[in-house]
């Protein structure tokens, strides 16, 4: 049952207090990708710091869960760019 509460908490905004830990995890993983791929992706997460600061004052469950989703999508896209699966103009040929 604890797992269900964790999942529901994401959509209720209960896990939003851990967004800083989530951001640090994404930065660390991005740094590791940059280390092994030669792509310095760690600096691109600086824009999320201000976004997170603004988002922390808003208590809307849809906004809180969307923050996690957006950050995860950006991390995945940057990972694909780091490994050169996709380029800045789309899928590499």
Swiss-Prot record:
Which species is the source of this protein? His1 virus (isolate Australia/Victoria) (His1V)
GO CC, alphabetical: host cell membrane; membrane
The record describes its membrane topology as: Multi-pass membrane protein
Give the transmembrane region(s).
Answer: 1-21, 22-42, 60-80
Q: What is this protein called?
A: Putative transmembrane protein ORF25
Name the source's superkingdom.
Viruses
UniProt keyword terms in alphabetical order: Host membrane, Membrane, Transmembrane, Transmembrane helix
Entry keyword Transmembrane: yes
* Location of this chain's protein in the cell: Host membrane
């Amino acid at each position: 049952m604890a797992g269900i509460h964790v999942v529901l908490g994401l959509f209720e905004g209960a896990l939003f207090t851990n967004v800083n830990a989530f951001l640090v995890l994404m930065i660390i993983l991005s740094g590791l990708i940059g280390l092994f791929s030669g792509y310095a992706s760690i600096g691109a997460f600086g824009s999320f710091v201000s976004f997170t600061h603004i988002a922390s004052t808003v208590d809307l469950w849809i906004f809180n869960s969307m923050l996690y989703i957006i950050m995860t999508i950006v991390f995945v896209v940057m990972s694909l760019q780091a490994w050169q699966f996709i380029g800045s103009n789309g899928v590499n040929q």
